[in-house]
């Protein structure tokens, strides 16, 4: 009864109006699962391949019909007949079927859509929530959210090099309260921006994209919004985080961090050592708890220096640096580079490999942050993954745009379902820092 009988993919649109895949899986019993695949704007060069058609006459070359066909004509034939509950065997079969190290033949987007749909169909068959199916009955930790309330870099037209300015309600007693704190700061920030005559349009991830005078101006404005909303900045209230997305402004030939790419003429151009110094200055000046991709994805020496200098005080997250890949993570652990990994399911392409990366991180004392992509859908799978793995942190955008709110609302439902056993760790989510 739990045998897969049908697999079907179609092309749908993501939050940026670009095509992506939606996959449906059916079993003999009538159990059903659906998965939708996100897409990134700033992508690591080592990520699994997102297969696009390249036909400029259709969706500007971004169509996903090839990936859809790969699901319907190749993957479906290979996995029909499998027990839907055997996630690992199905994921491994798809990896073998593709046969490339980066899933470039079938496309990571094709494989991931099936992987998610299989998990959802299995949960439906067993009549349990997805987070319970994936993590077992002892899953009870709600993640502390990283809320991206100001967008810069590749996610907006704002003249700021850093891609994301985030707030984290680390002092909140519950997820529900933490979400409220974040929403109230978001609205306080909007009011402040309006009063300054700055634009309140939002970027890809729902954060504002105003023309600030620089990084410090962005942070100072967030601190004012926290105060205006009635909260305190710091460990008992709300802390700040950055996604520098440094690979987006790193000049490989000159080996410098060229802020002029986003901030224009007159902006800083920093060496690797100067980039570390600058980040340390910001940490000394502001209540910063997390920095993502502070160094370029290939600047291993820079990462090691940054970790040596700040690794006990601040969460240093590898996104483009690790691309949710256990091979790169293992090297980072060995060389003491970074102390946290960002988990993006479409960077690696299957749920099995995603869970392996989280497990490896935890065993090494690294934290794991489950994350969305800038091109999202209404699919809320990552909310369930965050709870299923007891990851403790989730990064899923701002407090606007339904593609972001869908994940927060799912977490509210899960907290409700868990009732009194639900836990929200807040500042304790950063278990590898000296707090």
UniProtKB/Swiss-Prot annotation:
GO biological process entries: glycolytic process
GO molecular function terms attached to this record: magnesium ion binding; phosphopyruvate hydratase activity
Active site: 205, 344
SMART domains linked: Enolase_C, Enolase_N
Compartments in which it is found: Cytoplasm; Secreted; Cell surface; Secreted, Cell wall
Cofactor(s) listed: Mg(2+)
UniProt site (Important for binding of plasminogen): 428, 434-435
Catalytic activity: (2R)-2-phosphoglycerate = phosphoenolpyruvate + H2O
Residues where Mg(2+) binds: 243, 292, 319
Keywords: Cell wall, Cytoplasm, Glycolysis, Lyase, Magnesium, Metal-binding, Secreted, Virulence
Superkingdom of this protein's organism: Bacteria
Pfam families cross-referenced by the UniProt entry: Enolase_C (PF00113), Enolase_N (PF03952)
Binding site for (2R)-2-phosphoglycerate: 163, 344, 373-374, 395
UniProt-listed NCBIfam families: eno
Family statement: Belongs to the enolase family.
Known role: Catalyzes the reversible conversion of 2-phosphoglycerate (2-PG) into phosphoenolpyruvate (PEP). It is essential for the degradation of carbohydrates via glycolysis. 'Moonlights' as a plasminogen receptor. Binds plasminogen and more weakly plasmin when expressed on the bacterial cell surface; probably has more than one plasmin(ogen) binding site, may bind via Lys residues. Plasminogen binding potentially allows the bacterium to acquire surface-associated proteolytic activity, which in turn contributes to tissue invasion and virulence.
Protein name: Enolase
Originating species: Streptococcus pyogenes serotype M6 (strain ATCC BAA-946 / MGAS10394)
């Amino acid at each position: 009864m739990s045998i897969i009988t049908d697999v079907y993919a179609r092309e749908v649109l993501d939050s940026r109006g670009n095509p992506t895949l939606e996959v449906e899986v059916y079993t003999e019993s009538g159990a059903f699962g659906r998965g939708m695949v996100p897409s990134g704007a700033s992508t690591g060069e080592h990520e699994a391949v997102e297969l696009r058609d390249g036909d400029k006459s259709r969706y500007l070359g971004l169509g996903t019909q090839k990936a859809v066909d790969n699901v319907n004509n190749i993957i479906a034939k290979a996995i029909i007949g499998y027990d839907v509950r055997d996630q690992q065997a199905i994921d491994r079969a798809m990896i073998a079927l593709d046969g490339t190290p980066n899933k470039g033949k079938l496309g990571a987007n094709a494989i991931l859509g099936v992987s998610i749909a299989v998990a959802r169909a299995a949960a439906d068959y067993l009549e349990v929530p997805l987070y319970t199916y994936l993590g077992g009955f002892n899953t009870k930790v709600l993640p502390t959210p990283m809320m991206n309330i100001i967008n810069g870099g590749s996610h907006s037209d704002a003249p700021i090099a850093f891609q994301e300015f985030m707030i984290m309600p680390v002092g909140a007693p519950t997820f529900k309260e933490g979400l409220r704190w974040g929403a109230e700061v978001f609205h306080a920030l909007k009011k402040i921006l309006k009063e300054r005559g700055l634009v309140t349009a939002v970027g890809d991830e729902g954060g504002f994209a105003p023309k600030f005078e620089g990084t410090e101006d962005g942070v100072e404005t967030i601190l004012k919004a926290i105060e205006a909303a009635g909260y305190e900045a710091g460990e008992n209230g709300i802390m700040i985080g950055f996604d520098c997305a440094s690979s987006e402004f790193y000049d490989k030939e000159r080996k410098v961090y060229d802020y002029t790419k986003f901030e224009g003429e007159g902006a800083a151009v920093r060496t690797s050592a100067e980039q570390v110094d600058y980040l340390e200055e910001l940490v000394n000046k502001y209540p910063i708890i997390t920095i993502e991709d502070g160094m370029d994805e290939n600047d291993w020496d820079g990462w090691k220096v940054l970790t040596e200098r700040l690794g006990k005080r601040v969460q240093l997250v590898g996104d483009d640096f690790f691309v949710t890949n256990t091979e790169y993570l293992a090297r980072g652990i060995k060389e003491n580079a970074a102390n946290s990994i960002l988990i993006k399911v479409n960077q690696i392409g299957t749920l099995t490999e995603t869970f392996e990366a989280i497990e490896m991180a935890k065993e090494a004392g690294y934290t794991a942050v489950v994350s969305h992509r800038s091109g999202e859908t209404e699919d809320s799978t990552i909310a369930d993954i965050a709870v299923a793995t007891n990851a403790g942190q989730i990064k899923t955008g701002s407090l606007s745009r339904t593609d972001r709110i869908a994940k927060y609302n799912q977490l509210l439902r899960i907290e409700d379902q868990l009732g009194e056993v639900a836990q929200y760790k807040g500042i304790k989510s950063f278990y590898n820092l000296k707090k």
